[in-house]
Every structure is written in structure tokens, then in C-alpha cells.
Amino acid sequence: MARIKRGVIAHARHKKILKQAKGYYGARSRIYRVAHQAVIKAGQYAYRDRRQRKRQFRQLWISRINAAVRQSKMSYSNFIFGLKKASINIDRKILSDIAIFDLLSFNALVKKAKEALL
């Protein structure tokens, strides 16, 4: 029976994990067993946060729109409802960009939303 030698494969696998753990603090970047756990945990955090990023950006856009709309003495919910009634379909990302970079256009949208509510 032939002897199976797999030291090369194990070494390559360890090197791969330690390369992924580069920049981690202390033993997490030097010791394979700890580094392996850290890399797995980092992957879990990355997976979770890729989903949370979408929620967080939507929250940011909504708070920016809300702040801009309140300068015109209107609430965010009424503004969105007014836009829907006026059949203006602009998503929140674009609305927040307009609110930041083009206040005149945003005020025109607020005016249209107010007219649609009356």
C-alpha cells in the first residue's frame, strides 16, 4: 500500500487562510486555528452586512429627504404620498441626491406634492 503524503496541500490551505487573515490583530493573523475562526466569522459578518447595507442606505436617504422636506413645512410621509398622487415616480436615492445638490428642483417637487394633496 502506497503512503499518502498531503503535507503540501495542508500547507497551501493554511497559507491561504493566513493570507486572508492578514491585518488581523495578534494571534488572529499568525496562528492557523485562531485565524481560521476569525476568517469564518469575518465571512459571516460580511454576509450579514451586505444585506444591512441596503437597509442602512435607504434609512439615510429617507432621513435626508425628511430633513429637506421639513424646511418646506411638510412631513416626509405627506411628501411621498403627494408624489404618488401626482404620479411622480422618483426613488428615494434620487430624491435625496436632488435634495442635496439641486434644491430648486427639489422645491418644485415639494410644490407639486402639495398641489396633489389639495
UniProtKB/Swiss-Prot annotation:
SUPFAM superfamilies xrefs: Ribosomal protein L20 (SSF74731)
HAMAP family: Ribosomal_bL20
Cellular compartments per GO CC: ribonucleoprotein complex; ribosome
Family, per entry: Belongs to the bacterial ribosomal protein bL20 family.
Superkingdom in the source lineage: Bacteria
Keywords of this entry: Ribonucleoprotein, Ribosomal protein, RNA-binding, rRNA-binding
Gene: rplT
Molecular-function GO term, any one: rRNA binding
GO BP, sorted A to Z: ribosomal large subunit assembly; translation
Protein name: Large ribosomal subunit protein bL20
Pfam family membership, one: Ribosomal_L20
Function per UniProt: Binds directly to 23S ribosomal RNA and is necessary for the in vitro assembly process of the 50S ribosomal subunit. It is not involved in the protein synthesizing functions of that subunit.
